[in-house]
A protein has these predicted regions:
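Switch/connector loops and helix/strand junctions flanking conserved nucleotide-binding motifs
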Residues: 162-165, 187-192, 430-434, 460-465
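Alpha-helix capping/termination and helix-coil
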Residues: 374, 378, 382, 403-406, ...
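Short regulatory helix/loop adjacent to the ATP-binding pocket of P-loop NTPases
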Residues: 166-170, 431-446
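Conserved P-loop NTPase catalytic core
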Residues: 438-479, 483
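Basic- and hydrophobic-enriched, low-structure N-terminal and domain-boundary segments
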Residues: 1-125, 129-135, 142-148, 500-507
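P-loop NTPase motor domains
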Residues: 73, 78, 100-104, 108-419, ...
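Conserved P-loop NTPase motor module
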Residues: 310, 475-555
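Conserved H-loop
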Residues: 424-430
Length: 555
């Protein structure tokens, strides 16, 4: 800014006064006592020209400094945002976070991005508009025109408005054709159970993990374990009679309708007699028959109904609504979204659009299943040479709605698979309320190295942040005033005490106390909207700790 002002003034000065510097003489016209006087004497011009140049340079430096400082104060954020927007599309993958207190631009390089982000803040603190939206925008825009480098993303939206911004960001950089919106009665169909490459036990365990979302106290372990076993055996049967294609509708029928079960067993028995089953299928068939006929259907009616109700907490959503069934239990030939392999290989953007206030637990089920599918596919990259090394990202607003215990394992290992995890939640307590296990919450928090704290009233969050920033010696000063009197009388007229021969003393005590760098008032009162405390890494070391003014997406 200073250089621009300085050289502008220099060029202007040259254009206006060039003729004077090239002349050999100058005539002065001076008004003195209202008498016009024109001297004919030619003064020495070399000294005059040299003096004028020196004076101009000095005045130009002073003026340029004043102008540039005023402009910097008026538009610091605008200028930095312009730089952010231009640099965000550079060849290097990095995220611009905001401005430090010294107005320096803070960014995180690619190696630091793979150590994940945890963003917390109370409602209205600006965590979505100044952190989640800008970060999402930058990741979508990265190498948007390069089919080999653009990122593949999974974005979960349980409020129903995030995907609108995603579509806007994608359209602005020409990636609108990369968007896959998963929503009821939408253009894409998705079957969470169509995973032919996974064993039935793995799929059943994923379903149990999702069931835990509806068991906040985790007090139903026995029923959940039994439900997992029943689901595993039902998936085995369904794969055998339904050409290796499993849906929630088929699982629901096998579990709740004993006549439907016998019908399918009869069909498989016929195939067995015709020698159309492989050895693996015969083993799975015998295992399923033994479980259902000797354990499941042999239970007393009350126990059986409890176990059925545990399983149908998931399956009922898919059989009771036509639009839901059409979208998430389609026939194989109508299946349009077949998983995250293409997302990773081609750089697609998958967005879930299901408002949790409208779809309740169904939104949690689909969100959690998309997340688990994405995590499984990402980790498969480590064991396969067929995958590209394209970076991918998982972005989740209101993460506490579908946090699962297995997430900590993924966050700890996803760095090697080049996955950027950015999650947002109101507080650590909201995660604790969902998992009901403080140690599991602490492990998840530990594996999200980059932390951004907006204004918060949550004690758990504040205390954890204070410990993260550490302590330092603080000087505490206390003033004490005292008054002593030899004789004090009470005045009944003025209702006051009158002292005689009194003296006043003052003492000042200074002490050093080892205390937190940021006290609780800083988190609850001092932090402004769109400002945050950050703990950031570049992948090798912690590079920045302190206050940052964020970049709201609308500025």
């Amino acid at each position: 800014m200073f250089s621009l002002c300085f050289f502008t003034a220099l060029i202007t000065y040259y254009l206006y006064f060039n003729d004077i510097y090239l002349s050999n003489s100058i005539n002065f016209i001076i008004f003195n006592n209202s008498i016009l006087f024109t001297p004919t004497t030619t003064i020495s011009l070399n000294d005059l020209k040299l003096l004028s140049i020196v004076l101009f340079i000095l005045s130009d430096i002073i003026t340029s400094n004043i102008i540039s400082s005023k402009l910097t104060k008026l538009i610091p954020h605008h200028a930095k945002t312009k730089k952010q927007k231009s640099d965000a599309t550079s060849d290097s993958l990095e995220l611009y976070i905001g401005n430090s207190e010294a107005n320096d631009l803070i960014k995180i390089p690619e190696s630091g991005l793979y150590q994940n982000f945890l963003i917390t803040g109370s409602i209205g603190s600006g965590k979505t508009s100044s952190a989640m939206y800008p970060f999402t925008k930058q990741l979508i825009e990265y190498s948007s025109s390069d089919s080999a480098k653009k990122l593949g993303l999974l974005i979960l939206d349980v409020k129903g408005n995030y995907y609108l911004k995603v579509k806007e960001f994608a359209q602005n950089c020409g990636r609108q054709n990369d968007i896959i919106v998963i929503e009821p009665n939408g253009p894409y169909t998705y079957n969470p159970l169509d995973k032919p490459n996974l064993k039935p036990s793995v799929i059943a365990n994923q379903l149990k993990t999702i069931l835990l979302l509806f068991s906040p106290n985790n007090s139903e372990a026995y029923w959940l374990d039994k439900a997992e076993t029943a689901l595993c055996e039902a998936i085995k049967l369904c794969r055998m009679y339904n050409n290796n294609y499993v849906t929630f509708v088929e699982i629901h029928k096998l579990i709740t309708d004993i006549n439907y079960y016998h019908e399918k067993i009869k069909l498989l028995h016929s195939r067995f007699l015709d020698n159309k089953l492989s050895k693996v299928e015969i083993y799975d068939l015998l295992s399923a028959i033994k479980f259902f006929e000797q354990e499941f259907f042999a239970l007393d009616l009350r126990t059986l109904n409890i176990l059925k109700s545990e399983i149908t907490r998931i399956t009922n959503f898919f059989v009771s609504d036509y639009e839901i069934s059409k979208t998430f239990c389609p026939p194989r030939e109508n299946l349009s979204f077949k998983g995250f392999y293409d997302v990773i290989q081609s750089g697609k953007i998958v967005v879930l659009n299901m408002n949790i206030s409208k779809y309740k637990n169904l939104s949690k089920i689909i969100s959690a299943y998309l997340k688990l599918d994405f995590q499984t596919e990402v980790m498969s990259r480590l064991a396969s040479d067929s995958y590209s090394d394209r970076p991918v990202a998982f972005i989740s607003d209101e993460y506490s709605e579908y946090v699962t215990l297995t997430d900590s394992n993924f966050f700890s290992q996803s760095r090697e698979a080049k996955c950027i995890n950015i999650i947002s939640t109101q507080s650590y307590t909201s995660l604790l309320n969902a998992l009901n296990n403080k140690y599991s919450v602490e492990v998840i928090i530990q594996n999200l190295v980059n932390k951004i704290w907006f204004r918060s009233d949550d004690i758990f969050t504040i205390e954890s942040a204070q410990k993260q920033f550490g302590k330092k010696d603080r000087t505490h000063i206390s003033h004490t005033f005292s008054e002593n009197a030899k004789q004090t009388n009470y005045n009944f007229i003025t209702h006051s005490l009158n002292s005689k021969d009194s003296n006043i003393s003052e003492s000042i005590n200074t002490s050093t106390q080892f205390d937190y760098i940021y006290d609780s008032n800083f988190f609850t009162k001092t932090l402004k909207t769109f400002s945050s405390l950050c703990f950031l890494t570049d992948g090798n070391k912690i590079t920045y700790t302190g206050l940052i003014n964020m970049f709201p997406y609308f500025k």
